[in-house]
Structures are given as C-alpha cells and as structure tokens.
A protein has these predicted regions:
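Conserved inter-motif catalytic segment of the P-loop NTP-binding fold
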Residues: 12-13, 19, 25, 67-153, ...
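Short, small/acidic-rich helices and loops at N termini and domain boundaries
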Residues: 1-2
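Phosphate-binding/switch region of NTP-binding enzymes
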Residues: 36-37, 42, 47, 135, ...
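Pre-Walker A (Motif I) flank of P-loop NTPase domains
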Residues: 31-35, 70-71
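Hydrophobic positions on the alpha1 helix immediately C-terminal to the Walker A/P-loop
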Residues: 48-52
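DNA transaction DNA-binding modules
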Residues: 310-328
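Pre-Walker A adenine-sensing motif
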Residues: 18-29, 61-62
Length: 328
C-alpha cells in the first residue's frame, strides 16, 4: 500500500459533485489555490501584495476585484521589520481605508534568517496550523528558491512545497517573482517569469505586470488634472463661494484654476500652495503605468487591466487614458 488516493469513477461523482472552493479573489483565484505575480523590480509587486493583504483582511476590492474577508499571513523575506511595518501603514493610508481589521493581518519577518522553502514550509505549517488563514503571501520567492531556477525537476520540487502549504493549511498561497531579462512586450505572460517554465505553469493563476511607455501628452494631462484637483481642494477650504460660482471649464485647466486661487486665496496661503504645486509636479513625474495580464486555470481570461502605480499604491485606470499605450 501507499499513501496516494485511489482512482475515482466519474459515474459515481456525476450526480454528487463536490463543492468548488469559494473565490478568494473574485473571477481570479479560489481559496486553497496558488497564484504567482510576475513583473520587473520597479512594478511595485511588494506594494501590490500588501494592497492584497489589506483587501483580504478588510474584505475590500483589490485592483477592482472583490476579495473574500479573512485572516492573512504576510511572509516578509526582503524588508527589515521597521520598513515592512511602515510600508503596511503607508499603504493603508494611501488606500484611504479605515484600519478596522488589523488583527486579521499577521507578518512573519524573516529577513536575514530565512531558509530554503523545503525546510521553511514545515515550520510555516506548524506555526500557522491553528490560525485559520485564508491566504499566505510570500514576498519574494527568490529568497527561498531551492536549486537551480532553470531546472524543471528542481523547480517542480520547489513548487510542491506551496502545494503542501495549501493542502495542510487549507489556504491560498500567493507569491511574486521577477521577470526574465530582456524586452517583455512581445512575450506571452507565462513566458515572462524568470526561470523554468514550471514556474509559470504551476500556479492556478498567473498575473503579469508589464510597463507601459507614457507619452509626454499623457504626462502633461496627468499633471494638469492633479493641479486642478489641488486647486479645487484649496478653494473648497478657503473660498467655497468662489468654487460654487466657478465655471466647470475653469476647473479643468490648471492655468485658469491657479488664477482663481491667486485671486481668491489669502496671499500667505497662495504662496504656500505654490510650493505644494512643485511637489505635485514631481509626484506625477514619478508615476509609472502598467498593464496587468493574466493566465487563469479556474476562470475565463480577463481583459488586461491598465494601472497607475502612484506610490505607494496601484490605481486602476477607469477612464481609459492608458488603453492605447504599448508595453515596453
């Protein structure tokens, strides 16, 4: 005898189908399954995983997809403890969510003491057994890879460790990995993740981030919008009657909106606001744009999503500014 399951008759199962696992991320990933997020280092993958941790803990949306609410373990292999904790708080604040379910997020800080995944998995399982997590997030996996990442059999053994965590804890495992070297735009999503093809074919969902090349026109448009929004906020605070009477067109041009501020804000407030405008311009310059594509085992393929990475969070482009841009 062995410890493998017996063969099943389809005839016996036909009228008595087992329940499918409920979704963890609507139309993307089921509870108890595995997901890989791949992308270059500047894509903000760690921030995306922290956003996901928060969305699961609070039962909110992540990048436009509804998440099931539950407990989550974030395994931090890269950041020092203080940086990781600050990053969580920064992302919470940028997502503008009340921190109502902090008790649902646990962090395992392993920087400097990490081990290969085949030794780490049993320790993780033992510690997490009674915690009732619905997701374990491992960031990043290059820190725990055992063997040569270009070797199919060694990577199959490595990926099996994630299966053990899923099976024994009954939770999803989500992890991120870097892109292979070279231009990514012409490759399929499952060929972009670095290392053996096992990486891309093993998870139940593969999400892939590629950078979009921003035109100067779009940068100017974003700067204009950001300055107009800031002007509206200043007028709302200091000259609400002027804001109520202003024509909508005047509030869509940063030149006209700034003129309204200059004419109606107290001089000291306006001077301070001008230095704030310089910060806004710098912040907009630092924004990057991304296309999120996916290969899913359990759900139909979704239309690629276009995202802004507005440090420290990703924001879905809901108005279509990025839809015609090419990936780099």
């Amino acid at each position: 005898t062995d410890d493998l399951p017996e063969f099943e008759s389809m005839a016996e199962a036909w009228e008595n189908m087992p329940e499918l696992s409920p979704p963890l991320i609507e139309n993307v990933l089921r509870q108890g399954h595995k997901m890989l997020i791949a992308g270059p280092s500047k894509a903000g993958k760690s921030y995306a995983l922290i956003e996901m941790s928060i969305a699961i803990a609070e039962g909110r949306q992540w990048l436009g997809w509804q998440c099931a609410k539950g407990r989550v373990l974030y395994v931090n292999l890269e950041l020092d403890r203080a940086s990781c904790l600050h990053r969580f708080r920064d992302v919470y604040q940028a997502m503008e969510l009340p921190a109502a379910n902090l008790q649902s997020i646990d962090i395992w800080n392993l920087r400097g003491v990490t081990e290969p995944m085949d030794r780490l998995a049993p320790k993780l399982i033992r510690r997490a057994k009674k915690k009732q997590y619905i997701a374990v997030i491992i960031d990043p996996i290059y820190k725990v890879i055992t063997g040569d990442e270009n070797s199919a059999d060694q990577m199959a053994h490595f990926c099996n460790q994630f299966d053990k965590v899923c099976t024994q804890l009954g939770c999803a495992v989500i992890y991120c990995h870097h892109h292979s070297k070279g231009a990514q735009g012409g490759k399929r999503s499952m060929d972009r993740a670095s290392g053996s093809g096992v990486f891309a074919r093993d998870p139940d969902a593969l999400l892939d981030l590629t950078e979009l090349e921003l035109s100067e026109d779009i940068r100017k448009q974003e700067t204009n919008t950001a300055i107009c929004d800031a002007c509206v906020e200043q007028l709302r605070r200091h000259a609400p009657a002027v804001l109520a009477d202003a024509s909508p067109d005047a509030l869509l041009s940063h030149v006209e909106a700034l003129k309204l501020c200059q004419d109606n804000l107290p001089p000291a407030v306006y001077e301070a606001f001008l230095s704030e405008i310089e910060t806004i311009k710098r912040t907009v310059r630092q924004r990057t744009a991304w296309r999120l594509d996916g290969t899913l085992r359990e759900f139909p393929k979704f239309e690629p999503k276009n995202l802004w990475f507005r440090y420290p969070v990703h924001v879905e482009d809901t108005i279509g500014v990025l839809k015609d841009l090419q990936s780099e």
